[in-house]
Swiss-Prot record:
Gene Ontology MF, one: guanyl-nucleotide exchange factor activity
InterPro entries tied to this protein: Mog1, Mog1/PsbP_a/b/a-sand
Organism the protein comes from: Schizosaccharomyces pombe (strain 972 / ATCC 24843)
Keyword Cell cycle attached: yes
Location(s) in or outside the cell: Nucleus
Function of the protein: Involved in the Ran-GTPase system for nuclear protein import and poly(A)+ mRNA export. Required for mitosis-to-interphase transition.
Assigned protein family: Belongs to the MOG1 family.
GO BP terms, alphabetized: cell division; poly(A)+ mRNA export from nucleus; protein import into nucleus
Keyword set, alphabetical order: Cell cycle, Cell division, Mitosis, mRNA transport, Nucleus, Protein transport, Transport
Keyword Nucleus: yes
GO cellular component: cytoplasm; cytosol; nucleus
UniProt name for this protein: Nuclear import protein mog1
Length: 190
Protein backbone atom coordinates (compact mmCIF):
# COMPACT_ATOMS: atom_id res chain seq x y z
CA UNK A 1 0.00 0.00 0.00
CA UNK A 2 1.23 3.48 -0.90
CA UNK A 3 0.76 6.23 1.67
CA UNK A 4 -1.01 9.33 0.39
CA UNK A 5 -1.35 12.82 1.87
CA UNK A 6 1.17 12.15 4.62
CA UNK A 7 -0.36 8.78 5.47
CA UNK A 8 -3.94 10.06 5.83
CA UNK A 9 -5.01 7.75 3.01
CA UNK A 10 -3.40 4.75 1.37
CA UNK A 11 -3.99 2.76 -1.80
CA UNK A 12 -2.57 -0.14 -3.74
CA UNK A 13 -0.74 0.74 -6.98
CA UNK A 14 0.53 -1.52 -9.74
CA UNK A 15 4.34 -1.80 -9.97
CA UNK A 16 6.53 0.80 -11.67
CA UNK A 17 4.76 3.95 -10.46
CA UNK A 18 6.97 6.81 -9.25
CA UNK A 19 5.84 9.55 -6.86
CA UNK A 20 6.09 12.72 -8.99
CA UNK A 21 6.82 14.86 -5.92
CA UNK A 22 10.44 13.66 -6.11
CA UNK A 23 10.65 15.36 -9.53
CA UNK A 24 8.58 18.51 -9.11
CA UNK A 25 6.42 20.38 -6.64
CA UNK A 26 2.86 19.04 -6.34
CA UNK A 27 -0.04 21.02 -4.77
CA UNK A 28 -0.94 19.94 -1.22
CA UNK A 29 -4.35 18.64 -2.31
CA UNK A 30 -2.85 16.33 -4.97
CA UNK A 31 -0.80 13.18 -5.23
CA UNK A 32 0.68 12.42 -8.66
CA UNK A 33 2.28 9.17 -9.78
CA UNK A 34 4.02 8.51 -13.09
CA UNK A 35 4.37 5.07 -14.59
CA UNK A 36 7.77 3.98 -15.81
CA UNK A 37 6.61 1.59 -18.52
CA UNK A 38 5.44 1.48 -22.13
CA UNK A 39 1.91 2.59 -21.20
CA UNK A 40 3.20 5.88 -19.73
CA UNK A 41 0.20 6.28 -17.42
CA UNK A 42 -0.26 9.10 -14.92
CA UNK A 43 -2.40 8.72 -11.78
CA UNK A 44 -3.62 11.86 -10.01
CA UNK A 45 -5.51 11.77 -6.72
CA UNK A 46 -7.06 15.04 -5.59
CA UNK A 47 -8.98 16.08 -2.49
CA UNK A 48 -11.52 18.68 -3.60
CA UNK A 49 -14.54 20.39 -2.11
CA UNK A 50 -17.68 18.33 -2.76
CA UNK A 51 -19.75 19.55 -5.67
CA UNK A 52 -23.47 18.98 -6.01
CA UNK A 53 -24.46 16.50 -8.70
CA UNK A 54 -24.88 18.45 -11.95
CA UNK A 55 -28.23 18.23 -13.74
CA UNK A 56 -26.57 17.09 -16.97
CA UNK A 57 -24.28 14.29 -15.83
CA UNK A 58 -22.38 12.76 -12.96
CA UNK A 59 -19.92 14.33 -10.56
CA UNK A 60 -17.19 12.40 -12.43
CA UNK A 61 -18.33 13.99 -15.72
CA UNK A 62 -18.07 17.42 -14.10
CA UNK A 63 -14.48 16.68 -13.05
CA UNK A 64 -13.67 15.17 -16.49
CA UNK A 65 -14.82 18.43 -18.11
CA UNK A 66 -12.84 20.44 -15.57
CA UNK A 67 -9.73 18.43 -16.50
CA UNK A 68 -10.45 19.13 -20.19
CA UNK A 69 -10.61 22.85 -19.41
CA UNK A 70 -7.35 22.71 -17.42
CA UNK A 71 -5.74 20.74 -20.28
CA UNK A 72 -6.98 23.27 -22.84
CA UNK A 73 -8.36 20.26 -24.73
CA UNK A 74 -9.45 21.08 -28.27
CA UNK A 75 -11.80 18.07 -28.32
CA UNK A 76 -13.30 15.79 -25.71
CA UNK A 77 -15.72 12.91 -25.65
CA UNK A 78 -17.19 10.88 -22.81
CA UNK A 79 -17.44 7.18 -23.62
CA UNK A 80 -19.08 6.00 -20.41
CA UNK A 81 -20.65 7.78 -17.44
CA UNK A 82 -21.88 5.57 -14.61
CA UNK A 83 -22.35 5.27 -10.87
CA UNK A 84 -19.92 3.26 -8.79
CA UNK A 85 -21.20 0.61 -6.40
CA UNK A 86 -19.81 0.04 -2.90
CA UNK A 87 -17.75 -2.89 -4.21
CA UNK A 88 -15.94 -0.46 -6.53
CA UNK A 89 -14.57 1.49 -3.54
CA UNK A 90 -14.63 -1.21 -0.88
CA UNK A 91 -11.79 0.38 1.10
CA UNK A 92 -14.19 3.22 1.97
CA UNK A 93 -17.09 1.02 3.13
CA UNK A 94 -16.91 2.41 6.66
CA UNK A 95 -17.51 5.93 5.32
CA UNK A 96 -20.77 7.47 4.14
CA UNK A 97 -19.84 7.70 0.46
CA UNK A 98 -21.09 7.60 -3.10
CA UNK A 99 -19.17 7.24 -6.34
CA UNK A 100 -19.27 7.91 -10.05
CA UNK A 101 -17.03 7.06 -12.98
CA UNK A 102 -16.30 8.46 -16.43
CA UNK A 103 -14.21 7.11 -19.27
CA UNK A 104 -13.37 9.37 -22.17
CA UNK A 105 -10.77 10.96 -24.41
CA UNK A 106 -9.33 14.44 -24.82
CA UNK A 107 -7.19 15.95 -27.56
CA UNK A 108 -4.47 17.83 -25.70
CA UNK A 109 -1.64 20.05 -26.89
CA UNK A 110 1.78 19.45 -25.39
CA UNK A 111 2.58 22.01 -22.70
CA UNK A 112 3.97 25.20 -24.18
CA UNK A 113 3.03 24.30 -27.76
CA UNK A 114 0.28 25.87 -29.86
CA UNK A 115 0.65 23.83 -33.05
CA UNK A 116 -2.46 21.61 -33.41
CA UNK A 117 -0.29 18.96 -35.07
CA UNK A 118 1.52 18.46 -31.75
CA UNK A 119 -1.76 17.48 -30.06
CA UNK A 120 -2.09 14.03 -28.53
CA UNK A 121 -5.16 11.96 -27.80
CA UNK A 122 -5.28 11.01 -24.13
CA UNK A 123 -7.72 8.49 -22.69
CA UNK A 124 -8.84 9.83 -19.33
CA UNK A 125 -10.51 7.73 -16.67
CA UNK A 126 -12.05 9.56 -13.71
CA UNK A 127 -13.49 7.98 -10.57
CA UNK A 128 -14.93 10.17 -7.84
CA UNK A 129 -15.64 9.01 -4.30
CA UNK A 130 -17.74 11.60 -2.51
CA UNK A 131 -17.32 11.51 1.26
CA UNK A 132 -20.59 13.04 2.43
CA UNK A 133 -19.64 13.64 6.08
CA UNK A 134 -16.48 15.50 5.04
CA UNK A 135 -18.01 17.39 2.06
CA UNK A 136 -15.09 16.13 -0.03
CA UNK A 137 -14.70 14.63 -3.49
CA UNK A 138 -11.74 12.29 -3.82
CA UNK A 139 -11.00 12.54 -7.54
CA UNK A 140 -8.88 9.73 -8.96
CA UNK A 141 -7.86 10.19 -12.58
CA UNK A 142 -5.68 8.10 -14.87
CA UNK A 143 -4.28 9.67 -18.03
CA UNK A 144 -3.21 7.33 -20.81
CA UNK A 145 -1.63 8.81 -23.97
CA UNK A 146 -2.78 7.02 -27.13
CA UNK A 147 0.18 7.35 -29.52
CA UNK A 148 -1.42 5.36 -32.35
CA UNK A 149 -4.85 7.00 -32.26
CA UNK A 150 -4.99 9.77 -34.86
CA UNK A 151 -8.39 11.28 -34.02
CA UNK A 152 -10.53 11.40 -30.89
CA UNK A 153 -12.42 8.09 -30.92
CA UNK A 154 -16.18 8.32 -30.45
CA UNK A 155 -16.13 5.19 -28.30
CA UNK A 156 -13.59 2.97 -26.59
CA UNK A 157 -14.30 0.31 -29.23
CA UNK A 158 -12.92 2.68 -31.92
CA UNK A 159 -9.43 2.78 -30.43
CA UNK A 160 -6.92 1.02 -32.69
CA UNK A 161 -5.78 -2.43 -31.54
CA UNK A 162 -2.26 -1.06 -31.03
CA UNK A 163 -3.56 1.23 -28.24
CA UNK A 164 -6.04 -1.20 -26.65
CA UNK A 165 -3.48 -2.54 -24.16
CA UNK A 166 -2.89 1.01 -22.91
CA UNK A 167 -6.61 1.48 -22.32
CA UNK A 168 -6.84 -1.87 -20.51
CA UNK A 169 -3.87 -0.94 -18.29
CA UNK A 170 -5.46 2.43 -17.46
CA UNK A 171 -8.79 0.81 -16.59
CA UNK A 172 -7.14 -1.85 -14.42
CA UNK A 173 -5.07 0.83 -12.66
CA UNK A 174 -7.99 3.11 -11.78
CA UNK A 175 -10.07 0.16 -10.61
CA UNK A 176 -7.24 -1.12 -8.40
CA UNK A 177 -6.47 2.26 -6.85
CA UNK A 178 -10.15 3.13 -6.31
CA UNK A 179 -11.07 -0.25 -4.83
CA UNK A 180 -8.12 -0.26 -2.41
CA UNK A 181 -8.26 3.38 -1.26
CA UNK A 182 -8.56 3.56 2.55
CA UNK A 183 -9.04 6.56 4.82
CA UNK A 184 -6.56 6.20 7.69
CA UNK A 185 -6.66 9.65 9.34
CA UNK A 186 -9.88 11.68 9.16
CA UNK A 187 -8.13 14.83 10.40
CA UNK A 188 -6.89 15.34 6.83
CA UNK A 189 -10.30 16.94 6.21
CA UNK A 190 -10.19 19.25 9.26
Amino acid sequence: MVQLFGGALCADFPPKFLDASVLRQIPDNQEVFLQDSKENLTVIIELLEKIEKPFDGSVAAYHFNSIAFDNDASQRVIWRDKSLGEDDFEGMRSEKASGSSVQGCQRVLEKGKRNPESATNVAIFVNVITLIDFQTDIVISVNAPLPNTSSVPSSVENIPPSDQSIVRAALETIQRVTRSLVLVDKTVFA
